[in-house]
UniProtKB/Swiss-Prot annotation:
Keyword Ribonucleoprotein (UniProt): yes
InterPro entries reported in the protein's UniProt record: Ribosomal_bL36, Ribosomal_bL36_sp, Ribosomal_L36_bact
GO molecular function, one term: structural constituent of ribosome
Descriptive protein name: Large ribosomal subunit protein bL36B
Origin organism lineage: Bacteria, Pseudomonadati, Pseudomonadota, Gammaproteobacteria, Pseudomonadales
Family indicated by similarity: Belongs to the bacterial ribosomal protein bL36 family.
Any single biological process term in GO: translation
Entry keywords, A to Z: Ribonucleoprotein, Ribosomal protein
Classification via Pfam families: Ribosomal_L36
Amino acid sequence: MKVLASLKQAKLRHRDCQVVKRRGRLYVICKSNPRFKCVQGRPKPKIKRR
């Protein structure tokens, strides 16, 4: 899975590519051709509670 700064071209690589937001990150997933998977961003840091 590649880490990219921009997902604009990544979502246009294949007609089955979808943009999904999970845990504060943006993912491009492609079930028919998994080599097009990529991610953008970092998750927000978790707040430690006592």
